[in-house]
Every structure is written in C-alpha cells, then in structure tokens.
Amino acid sequence: MRLYDDELKIYYEIKEAQGDTYIVISDADKKLNGIDIPEEIEGRPVRHIAKKAFLGCKGLRHVSIPGTVRSVGEWAFAFCDNLTRVEMQRGRIELGKGVFKNDLNLREMDVYDEGTEEPDRIMVSHLMAAAPVIMDAEYLLDTLHCGEDEWLGKWDTKLSHILSLKDNDGYHLYVLCGEEDFHFDYEEYLEYNREKKSSLCMLRLVNDIALKEEDKEPLRDYLRDHTSGCESEAAIRMLLKRHGDDRDYYRMMLDIGAINDGNLEAVLNMMGDRHAQMKAYLIEECGKKKADFFDDLLL
C-alpha cells in the first residue's frame, strides 16, 4: 500500500524481506523544492529510493540521502532542472542508471564522512557532480571511494580522453539517431563540445586536489586557446554561464593568462550588464598587473 507523508511531501511503501521491515520512497510531490530524507519513517529505516521517484521535480534544489539508503533506482532524480546539491553519507550505495540524467545545474555531490578535510571534501563534491552531468561517466559515481587517489586518477583519465576527442566526434551518430535533449547544427555541435571541454578544464584547475603540475598545463593551454579573441571563445562563455559570480574561477583565468590586458575589454563586453562585482575585480586585477609590469621596468 502506498502512503503519503504530508510533511516530507513524499509517497512511500512499507516492505518486508528476510525479517527486515523497511521503507521504500516511491514518488514525490512535483512541487517539492528540497528534501532531507530521514533515516526512518514510522520507526522503520529508509532503505531504497525507487525508480523515477523524484523524476521531473523541476523545483527541487537540494537532496540529502541518509546512510540507511542502500539503493537509488534508475532515473530517480532525472530531469530535476534546478537540482544543484546532493548530500550522501560515504558508503556503498547502489545508484541506478541515469539517476541524475539531464540535471544540468547540478554543482555539488557531497559525500561526507568524519575523516575528510573540509577543502578536499568540497573539491571532490564538485568533481563528483560533473561525472554524470558533463562527463557522461556514471561509473565515477562511487560513494565509497570518491576522493581517493585511484578515483581521482580515473576522473583525470576520463578528462584526458574527452580532451583528446575531435570536436566533431559522434556527430554522425547524433544526426542518424537523434538526441531528444539537444538540437544542434554542425557548428553548434562543435561549440557544444568545446564548451564541455572548457568547463571541465576550469573545474579541475580550481578543484585541483592531487593534480600534478605537469597535468595542469594541458588544461591551461586549452583554456588559453579558447578564450576571448580566439577562433572559439568557449572558455569565456562557460565561465560566465556556469561560474558567473565565482571569484575563484576568475582568479584562475587571470593567473593562467586566459584573461589578460589584451582581451579584458572584449571579456567585459561579453559580460554586458551582469556580474558587476566580477567586472570590477577583473579591472582592478588587470590594473595591478600592468602597474607591476611598469614597476619591474623601473628597477
């Protein structure tokens, strides 16, 4: 029998197997804007989130999944357009196929435990969120080993593979088979892939946990080759689209020379009347760099 929790705004079922009585969350109010799933409902542990339970909850922004949950079904949180943050306790959770499909605004997937340093945990949460959304790499949704050296190596290997692909890779399949979520002509398809690569390069350089110096340079090169003034300005477009007011990303782009005195005006024009604080920051920092340059000449 399906029951409804008026406070949580979810539907659930009470199941029993091998002497264990537990809760399965089966559906949710589509107007839900956030939920901290409890460890127990009616004194019974929440063990499973069913297939498509939160599918299409357009207003859902954050989800917290307790450590009692053992599995999350296919497409459970798919097409949640505004989902930005997911919290899960570190442990072995079975995540179904397409569990976060098309959640394009997902930015953090925080897998927490008591032993992880806060800065590392934050960086890993950003890398985890990119796995299903940008990288199409659901095998990286490893809630037990994420953040470990081997997992980070797999993440970086996937990034290297993505960067090695030609921008038109897969276009013939896209044309033949179609893709319900995207509609591109050839040039738009090329730019889409450049934007994806730029976004991942920025993400990894800012969240540089265990990233070796020699592995940073190809990422920097890619961003410098796709900044304002280049044939493709994908890096600046994604900077503004995904990180419009995040100073850490602007600082990184300044540090690597992807934003500089030569293209500052063009970048500011692309920003239009948005991101006023970041515009002021860029103007100030480029001014400092110019002053430092002339000071060095006088020495």
Indicate residue ranges for each PLM-predicted region:
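Short amphipathic alpha-helical interaction segments
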Residues: 71, 245-248
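Ankyrin-repeat intra-repeat helix-capping/turn positions
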Residues: 244-245, 274
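Structural signature of tandem-repeat unit edges
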Residues: 2-23, 29-48, 58-71, 81-94, ...
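Short amphipathic alpha-helical segments and helix-helix/interface helices
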Residues: 96-100, 250, 279
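Charge-dense, extended regions
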Residues: 252, 257-258, 266-299
